[in-house]
Regions:
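Juxtamembrane extracytoplasmic/periplasmic/luminal helical "stalk" adjacent to the first N-terminal
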Residues: 1-54
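Extracytoplasmic/periplasmic ligand-binding sensor regions of membrane-associated signaling proteins
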Residues: 48, 71-74, 78, 83-157, ...
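Sec/Tat-exported extracytoplasmic proteins
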Residues: 31, 46-49, 68-72, 168
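Stable alpha-helical elements in mature extracytoplasmic
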Residues: 27, 38, 60, 104, ...
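Short, surface-exposed beta-strand-loop junctions and turns on beta-sheet-rich folds
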Residues: 95-96, 191-193
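Solvent-exposed, extracytoplasmic
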Residues: 57-71, 150-192
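Short, hydrophobic-rich beta-strand element in sensory/regulatory alpha-beta domains
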Residues: 42, 75-80, 173-176
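A charged amphipathic helix-loop-strand protein-protein interaction module that recurs
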Residues: 104, 192-196
Length: 196
């Protein structure tokens, strides 16, 4: 009887470990796929518009506006800044204020070949809609001359939240995301943590 009980206990522990490992691998793959999709949108905007058209060209503004329209389910807004943080172009729902002190701006300036994921920002309080502030260093054309700057894309968090929310309901584990300064980007129990 004791041997049988030990066998069952060992079996259940092993199955739990295997299931947790499988869930972790699926979660990692789903998040990786979503990040690849986001990065692809960001790189497409950069290489096919920002780097291709002079910002003084009316096609530049039209193409960026169309990019937002065609991705309206995922993109809240776009903006382009010079390396001093001065706004060069922004979509209608963003402000033209200087951004040189924002963490997403300095991260993009300091990490030239990296797409930087900044903190969440609430954009629709009534619907509790949030965006990730995603940025990257870019080269743009202004009056025929190549310049350096930062591209900001505000991307709705819904797709990543949906992936992570699935794991909130598991019996034995949950997942959370942190930014590079150890602030929560996502935690399934953030409301409970915030309220103490």
């Amino acid at each position: 009887m004791i041997l049988f009980s030990h066998y069952i206990s060992t079996y259940l522990v092993r199955k739990t470990i295997e299931e947790t490992s499988r869930q972790k691998n699926v979660l990692a793959q789903n998040i990786e796929n979503e990040i690849d999709s986001i990065n692809s949108i960001m790189n497409n905007i950069y290489y096919n518009t920002i780097k291709k058209y002079d910002i003084q060209d009316k096609n530049f503004k039209t193409i960026l506006a169309n990019e937002i329209t065609s991705n309206s389910e995922t993109i809240y807004g776009l903006a382009l800044y010079d390396t001093d943080g001065k706004n060069l172009w922004h979509s209608n729902n963003l402000t033209s204020t200087s951004m040189q002190n924002e963490s997403w701006f300095t991260q993009a300036k300091d990490n030239i070949e990296t797409i930087c994921y900044g903190s969440k920002k609430l954009v629709y309080p009534d619907n509790v809609k949030q965006v990730f502030q995603i940025s990257r260093y870019v080269e743009y054309i202004n009056h025929g001359k190549m310049k350096s700057g930062v591209l900001l894309m505000q991307y709705y968090t819904d797709s990543i939240d949906a992936i992570l929310e699935h794991y909130k309901n598991t019996q034995n584990s949950y997942c959370y995301l942190l930014d590079n300064t150890s602030n929560f980007l996502y935690h399934p129990f953030i409301k409970e943590i915030s309220s103490g």
